Design a protein with these regions (language model features):
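Metal-dependent phosphoesterase/phosphodiesterase active-site architecture
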Residues: 94-131, 136-146, 150-165, 170-171, ...
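Bacterial N-terminal signal peptides that target proteins for export
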Residues: 1-10
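Beta-rich interaction/scaffold domains
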Residues: 24-96
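Short, surface-exposed alpha-helical recognition segments that flank or form part
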Residues: 65, 239-243, 278-279, 365-372, ...
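Divalent metal-dependent phosphoesterase catalytic cores across multiple superfamilies
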Residues: 97-305, 310-337, 382-386, 412-428, ...
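C-terminal motif of bacterial Sec signal peptides marking the signal peptidase cleavage site
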Residues: 19-22
């Protein structure tokens, strides 16, 4: 009985428990844990070819120019990874130059060109070593230098250039290379001066230091008794983007191919487009490394500054090595060093000067005065003439115009320049004034410095070819111009892409005011019958232009050429002769 009761109670308990459990809500099973993410610590996302290049090659290990070229290629690939762009990228990698190598090299006439030559170049900020090697071998090779056969070595001085704005306002390079407009780079500027060279000798030169050399350049010292020779003048390259770079390089290649015998190249300013505080060192770099590279390797440069070259960074001073006596010896020194200097080559006295600093000391647009020009530049002209009174020819080189016939003719500065400099030109009997700034081909004068009229009796042999248009507003070509009683003014258009166009007679008459005492403004040029001053070819040739000037026994022969293509071919634009029948006199203030 007890045993049955136990099993009965156990059965009853299990029945009740089952019933109770059956009445509860069904239990939803817990979801399984989500799978763990894959372990990515060892996974490397493949980089593109240009991304690898961007991280592998840094600016601090290579020269600034070669690394910027790589940055342009990287940016192009990131936008369009075509095979052509990738090939360019690989080429730029192969062209990278170690940071120790020099760039922006140039030779400058500095002092007596029979026995002296000056040199200038840049390196990255960390390179303080520098020297020039010169060898009396024409078209020398690296082997000639390595053979140490008469190599002259000159140690260079250096100056650290701090925080030069690299891109600045040059929008092309900002976009093309992904460089900030505010980026500033440091460089070392190296300067060396060779003295006691042998007159009439062809030299080759290179700069840098042991194992880190520039390409080889060439020059020839003036002969001891220099006879006939040729020099070149061109200006206003205004480097700012590839189109401007290419046009100026066309001109430089044409110079070297057309007149390989040229002794030097005159360049009166506006090397670059962007001046002021937002200027671009990249533009200067491209002028040296690309645009003018053919000429720079072939001959020394004779330079002075233009208004687009001015900047607080004084890039101009860092890049050239010209005579600085004016800054050291005259009361009012200009901003840049070496923009006012003279030299004699053969039978020509060259006055290289700048009117850019005319505003220093007392000046007035109202009465057209500048004590800087009249007192300091004027005194310097007299000193140059006094030191070299016997040359047959006197030629000035400056950027700004005393006379011009395009967009700058109505600026407010030319009346100041005329009022201050015409008496100086008259006193020193300047034969030829080589000018820039106006970007048009302009033959002016000879101009009587007192009446401001052309001396028509001094002109002969002009050819009438039809004009009245932008190609040739006057319709004249060629001609012989005698400078006995007035100066011949010349603007050789532009070696680059930035072009202005000639003003017509009608426009010049509208721009004239018959009250020359009025304040000069942007509408008036203040010279009556101004168009008559344009006595020869006057127009826009629409191609890069340079002029070869040959100093002959009886004349200065001008041959102007247009650069036709990228191979250095050129076509003749115009030929003129400058003659003189009187001997030069000593300025009256010196007698």
């Amino acid at each position: 009985m007890k045993k049955q009761s136990f099993f009965y109670l156990l059965s009853l308990f299990m029945t009740v428990s089952f019933a109770f459990t059956s009445c509860k809500e069904p239990v939803t099973p817990e979801p399984p844990d989500p799978p763990l993410p894959p372990d990515t610590s060892e996974v490397v996302i493949p980089k593109t070819e240009w991304e690898k290049a961007d991280s592998a090659y840094t600016r601090y290990d290579y020269t600034v120019p070669s690394h910027t070229a790589l940055k342009i290629a990287i940016t192009a690939c990131a936008s369009d990874p075509s095979e052509a762009n990738l090939e360019t990228l690989r080429l730029r990698i192969s062209e990278l130059k170690p940071k120790t190598e020099p760039y922006c090299m140039v030779a400058n006439i500095n002092g007596d060109p029979k026995t002296r030559m000056a040199f200038n170049w840049f390196t990255n900020d960390s390179v303080f070593e520098g020297e020039v090697q010169i060898i009396p071998v024409e078209n020398a090779t690296v082997e000639d230098f390595e053979g140490n056969n008469g190599v002259i070595t000159i140690r260079a001085d250096y100056e650290r250039t701090r925080k030069l704005r690299y891109a600045g306002k040059a929008r092309y390079i900002v976009n093309a290379a992904g460089i900030s407009a505010a980026d500033r780079y440091n460089y070392i500027a190296h300067k060396a001066l060779a003295e006691n060279l042998t007159p009439g000798t062809a030299y080759s030169w290179r700069c840098g230091y042991d194992g880190h050399w520039s390409p080889i350049g060439h020059f020839r010292t003036e002969d001891a008794n220099q006879g006939e020779y040729t020099f070149v003048v061109m200006s206003d390259s205004h480097i700012e983007n590839p189109t401007f770079i290419k046009e100026a390089r066309r001109c430089a290649k044409a110079v070297v191919k057309t007149v390989p015998e040229a002794r030097f190249c005159c360049f009166p300013g506006d090397f670059v487009e962007d001046g002021d505080a937002s200027n671009s060192e990249w533009e200067w770099e491209r002028w040296f490394e690309e645009s003018m590279e053919p000429v720079i390797k072939a001959m020394p440069m004779v330079v002075t500054d233009g208004n687009h070259d001015d900047s607080p960074n004084i890039n101009y001073t860092y890049h050239f090595n010209t005579n600085n006596d004016f800054n050291q010896n005259y009361t009012s020194a200009p901003q840049f060093q070496g923009i006012v200097y003279g030299f004699v080559y053969g039978d020509v006295l060259f006055y290289v000067f700048s009117m850019q600093d005319f505003w220093r000391e007392t000046h007035s647009y109202l009465d057209w005065t500048s004590t800087y020009l009249t007192d300091h530049i004027g005194s310097w002209f007299r000193d140059q003439t006094m030191a070299n009174p016997g040359t047959q020819w006197r030629v000035s080189l400056a950027h700004f115009n005393l006379f011009s016939g395009s967009d700058h003719s109505t600026d407010k500065e030319p009346p100041v320049f005329r009022h201050c400099m015409l008496p100086v030109f008259k006193e020193n009997e300047i034969d030829v004034a080589l000018q820039g700034h106006d970007h048009t081909y302009e033959v002016i004068g000879p101009v009587d410095p007192d009446s401001l009229t052309p001396i028509l009796s001094a002109i002969s042999d002009r050819e009438e070819v039809g004009g009245g248009n932008n190609k040739n507003m006057t319709g004249y070509k060629g001609g012989t111009y005698c400078t006995d009683d007035g100066t011949f003014y010349f603007i050789g258009a532009t070696c680059g892409y930035k072009r202005y166009y000639p003003h017509s007679r009608e426009r010049m008459e509208r721009e004239y005011t018959d009250d020359i005492n009025l304040l000069q403004d942007d509408k008036h040029h203040n010279v009556k019958n101004y168009f008559d001053l344009f006595t020869g070819m006057f127009g826009q040739p629409e191609k890069p232009c340079f002029t070869a000037i040959t100093v002959k026994e009886d004349c200065l022969e001008f041959n102007s050429y247009l650069a036709d293509d990228d191979q250095g071919n050129a076509s003749l634009l115009n030929t003129m002769r400058i003659v003189r029948t009187k001997n030069h006199s000593i300025p009256t203030m010196m007698q």
